[in-house]
């Protein structure tokens, strides 16, 4: 996959470990996210995804659990035809502590997956299923297997 680094000294996405699904995205600049505020953080890169694939920007679990930092739109979707700079919309859920980002900090992860380009066919009635129209909470909270 090709990547364009948009500033000198930029950061090509990398996986921390061989088996990782996500490639770390790093901040191209410093930033401060105030408590209960959101901010667009640029990565300084653009990528060319192959047709039939999309990139999904996901939160980093350590930032979420240790600092309350997550994504406003999770996941953020990068379509195969998009060639602009990848930006990440972060939110600081902490009520009191500002979050400081340094240039090069890992701020999110990019997971690349194949996508199905489906077509929709309008029908009068959908076929039945075991679940039917049961919605939120329909499977229960507790394990009932025995």
From Swiss-Prot:
GO terms for molecular function: dUTP diphosphatase activity; magnesium ion binding. It comes from the Bacteria. The keyword Metal-binding applies. Its cofactor is Mg(2+). One of its GO terms (biological process) is dUMP biosynthetic process. SUPFAM superfamilies: dUTPase-like. It catalyses: dUTP + H2O = dUMP + diphosphate + H(+). Keywords: Hydrolase, Magnesium, Metal-binding, Nucleotide metabolism. The keyword Metal-binding applies. Pathway: Pyrimidine metabolism; dUMP biosynthesis; dUMP from dCTP (dUTP route): step 2/2. It is an enzyme of class 3 (hydrolase). It holds the Pfam family dUTPase. InterPro entries: dUTPase, dUTPase-like, dUTPase-like_sf, dUTPase_trimeric. Its EC number is 3.6.1.23. Substrate binds at residues 60-62, 73, 77-79. This enzyme is involved in nucleotide metabolism: it produces dUMP, the immediate precursor of thymidine nucleotides and it decreases the intracellular concentration of dUTP so that uracil cannot be incorporated into DNA. HAMAP family: dUTPase_bact. Belongs to the dUTPase family. This is Deoxyuridine 5'-triphosphate nucleotidohydrolase.
